[in-house]
Amino acid sequence: MIQERADIEKAYASNLRKFAARLEMFLRTGVEYGTATNILSGLAKEAEDNAELHSNIAAGLINPVQLGIKNWQRENFHKSSISTSIKEVKNFDSEFENAQKTWYKHYKNVNRCKKEYFHACKTVRSLQVQVQNAKNEPFGTPEQLRKIEDKLRKGIMEEEKTRKAYEEALSSLSDVTPRYIEDMTQVFNKAQAFERERIIYFKEQALQMQEVLDISAKPNLSQIFVGLRETVAKVDADADLKKWSLAYGVDMAPNFPVFQEYSPEMSALGKKGRSALADGSSGGVTLTSLKTITSPDRGGPIPGTTDSGSNISTSPVHTTAYGSNSYDHGSEGATPSDYTSSVNGAAAAISKEKQRVEDTPPYPDFVDDGRPGVPIRALYDYVGVEADELSFNSGDLFEKLEDEDEQGWCKGRKDGRVGLYPRQLR
């Protein structure tokens, strides 16, 4: 019984924890925002605290209540080694049997004498009827009447004999009855004392069980719901709406399109420049500067030679920037052969890097590595413009893998595909 109630408390606590986990998961989806998230977090905490409370109740029912009862049973009820009966019960049965053994022997004798006396009386009554019928029978003979009368006389004698034996048996039973009453009373009182001890202990354990189950007496119960009320009271609708308006509404800072001059040198350095070559850990070269250089053969300024994969700028005579090292060849008296050698060397390096980049996937950063993400929900429709962008409809669920970069783009995963999406989408 106690174990069953403890299992009920455990199951209730388990369901509360599952409910709290679902609230936490829903909270992480980002559907609710601002101070309104206090409602979900408050309900989740209330469920967790109540689950802990009922887990403690289940533990309290097992120990000390159930454990105490089992220990008391082991100390007061001992099982027999040769049977499943309880030794104490068997001992009481034996004591009751011994207390009434002598009296019971006389009692059986009384029942036997009574049965014999009643049988003799029945026989006499039957013979008396037969004698009366024989006297009234016109065709009867004197010999038949005499035989029946002889049987009647013997029956009357047997009746007297059994009556006397019956009375003597009752007298003997009366003589042993006081001792029988005394012995039976002694054994009965002993059994009553044992049963009284059991009932008193059972009552004590029931009261202890009541203390464990009485959640109204738990000091932390009221604090659970006071904390829930205080948490929910912190919800401020006006503050949430104002914050939303500042982030996504009419109060947000305007960012209308303005005219931008096309710059092919910088097009590879935007949000899509995430190749292994551009990664600092890949050992590739990095753009250090953009310069206007003068060709000795042309006598006018030409744009510096750059490559989106290697990000190298070259200069005919002044400085060639490769990685973080600069080499000064002098600015005076440079010959065309010096210029040609410098450019050819840089061009060879650029060609080598181009070949290595062509052998790598177009967007190696967007290969799904199976890492877990944070579930979020799209607030607006968005159609990807380039191949590494994700497309969504309002309300779609997807996963965020990385926070936004300096360009305002986040990395996410939808339907098993990894790509970029604008921060304002979520």
Swiss-Prot record:
Domain SH3: 371-426
Any one GO molecular function term: phospholipid binding
Coiled coil: none
Biased composition (Polar residues): 305-315
Keyword Coiled coil: yes
One example of a Gene Ontology biological process annotation: regulation of endocytosis
Pfam name, any one: SH3_1
Gene Ontology cellular component terms for the protein in this record: endosome; plasma membrane
Transport recorded as keyword: no
Sequence segments annotated as region (Disordered): 287-315, 350-369
Alphabetical list of InterPro entries matching this protein: AH/BAR_dom_sf, F_BAR, SH3-like_dom_sf, SH3_domain
SUPFAM superfamilies in the cross-refs: BAR/IMD domain-like, SH3-domain
Record keywords: Coiled coil, SH3 domain
Protein name as it appears in the record: Antigen EM13
Source species of the chain: Echinococcus multilocularis
